Amino acid sequence: MSSAKNSNSHGDFFTPLIEGFVEMFQVLITKAVESFPKLLKNIGTPQITINQSSMKLVLSMLDCERQTVDQAHLGWAINTNRPYPLEYFDPSKNTFIVGSSGWGKSNLLSVLQENCIQRKQGLIFIDPKGSLEAIRNFKKLCRYYGRNYYIFSEFDKEAGSFNPIADMTNSQRVSMIMRSFDWGKRPNQYYLNEAQKALDDVLSSLTAKGEEFDLHDVYKKLKTEHNKEETSGLISQFQLLLNSDFGKLFKKANEFGKPSATMKKAWEEKACIYIGCSTQGYSTLAKTVGKLFVSEAMNLSYWIGKTYEDSHKIKENSLGLFIDEAGSVIYPDFLDLVNKCRSSGINVYTAVQSYSDIEMVADSEILMKQFFESYSNWFIQKQTNTENAEKLASACGTFLAQKTTLATESGSESGKGTIREGYEYLCHPDIIKSINVGQTILLEHNPKWLSLINVRDVRGSNAFKDVKEVDKSAPIAPIKKGLGRK
């Protein structure tokens, strides 16, 4: 009987504990069931917090000479001590490249252009240098990957005819021509208006015939029907352009009857276009040529956006628009293209030699600040000007750091001092001024990250290796050099 009492007393003792554990377990199960959908929702979208100080670049990193030759890599990321795969790079966020002449900008552009073609994109390269080497490298790239191409050059044997005014409305043609010509800093508004009216009248008359026409047709009709003082500036600029070495290229068909090239046609074919307009050899005239093609690119972006609703179709036909020495050929309205081109699948790569080149476009620092907001990928190379280096260092950002000061007595440390917080550069201006040939600082946004990279030497790429002399001017379509590459 006593044993039964003991058993009951033990049961009475443990019963509240057991009930408490059961109740707590039920609460945990309930909470888990309530939280489970939230856990599922967050799977795959982890929230990563990056410590700003971990991105800091230091001067000693510039001594690293480690390289990578893998064509899948942009180069060797010194601060993370590993290759930087090109698949990490997002060209759809638009890319701004700034670097002094002779410090590896052309090599970087070639790496990015090859990546563009590897992504099965079209390619348009507006090059105010217009050099033989640039054209040869462009052809090598296209031949290796079996891509059709069109060349605009005053001296290249494969250069064809172009008709940049073909695929647009008359209003767009008027805007394109007027902003491409040089009217001076303070043009007479009356003369501008009269020139536009005459141009619109000529274009309307030519359009009514229902046949393709080119800049030569516009010039002839202007000279015949609107040759007066108010339009003399417009007619003179047409004459200088079309009588120049570039004039023979602005025709609706070449001497063999082959149709002229347009950016719309290249976009539909996924073909590549090289535009050579040497500002060194032709100054203002070459700038006019460059602006004509930049305007055509803007109109292509507009046409794609209004024609296609299917974002997948646009993505399939995306293209890279590369503009080297951009300060020579762009104008303030160019930012409209940069800000809106993502919806049309155009990835813009804008390269200049210095921060000041963009300021000169509109004679204002405001434009440069707008550029800061419009490009999410920044490649920064050598800058010799202290002010430019400081502005670019500021763009890279700062982080909050502790700074320690020590007190001294009679020239020796006293053991006393202060600790205070202050902001330090993630990339000090001295790094930008001291960067070596072939190195670049890559600033990316969303998420923000800073990399110091030894850019891969494109001469090691199979696409850019020298070919036999007989192949240098061979037709492209039948060549299949890319089949054996690794």
Give the predicted meaning of each segment.
Residues 13, 17, 21-24, 28, ...:
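Short acidic-hydrophobic sequence patches enriched in Asp/Glu that either
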Residues 1-43, 399-421, 483-485:
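Glycine- and small hydrophobic-rich membrane-insertion segments that are intrinsically disordered
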Residues 17, 28-82, 86-346, 430-452, ...:
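P-loop NTPase motor domains
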Residues 166-171, 338-340, 344, 351-441:
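Conserved ATP-driven motor cores of ASCE-family P-loop NTPases powering translocation/secretion/packaging/pilus
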